[in-house]
Amino acid sequence: MDVIGDLSMDNYIFQYYQKIQDGSISVGKWIGLLFSYIVKGLEEKEFTFNQKKANNAISWIEEHCFHVEGVLAPGNLKLELWQKALISVMFGICDNDTGNRRFREVVLVVARKNGKSLLASAIANYIFQVDGGFGCRVYNVAPKLEQADIIYNNTWAMIQLDPEYIQKKESVSEERKHTHNKVDADETLVKKRMSDLFIPATNSTMKKSVQTQKNLMDSILH
C-alpha cells in the first residue's frame, strides 16, 4: 500500500520516535516535540504517511548520492536512522485530501562537521533530478558565494560519480560517433553550464546565489 494508516516498525519515523521514547537515542527538546507531533498527527489521521514516497527518496539517495571527500569517498551515502526519519517526514507526510507533501519548509540545524552539507546536497540532488517535476528550480543560497558553492559543487560531484550518469554519458558519446542527428538520450543528461546545472529534458536547473545575512534570516522567519 502506498498510504500506510498504521505505524509499523517499517516506518523510520516511528523507529526513531520509539528510540527517543525509550532513551536509546538522546535528542534535544524541539526534536522530541517535533516527532511527538508527527506521530500523534499520524495516529489521529490529521495527515497520512506515504511509505512509497518516503522510501523512493531514501532508496534513490542511497543509490545515486556519494561521499565526495574524506576516507569514505567515493562510496555510496548510507543514511543513518535520524536522516531516514527526516527524509520520511519531508517526502512521506502528505495532506489527507490532495496527497501532496504536508511540509513545504524544513529548518535543519546540525553542528559543524556532522555532514549537514552532504545531506543537503543529497536532498537537493533528489529534488533536482527526480522529485521537483518539470521546470524544477533548486537554489543554493548563502551569505558568501564560497558557502553557496559547497552544496552546488557537492551535487555536481555526486552526479559525476553516479554509474547511471556515467553509463548514459558513454552511451551518448558512442551514439554520436554514428550519427549527425540529435541524440535523444543527451537531453536527459545533467549539463554543467557557466551559471547552473541544467537538465534539458525537464527544463530543470540548480543555481547558487548570495544573500545578506538579514535577507536569509527574513526568508527563514517569514
Name the predicted role of every residue range.
Residues 2-222:
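Phosphate/NTP-binding elements of NTP-utilizing enzymes
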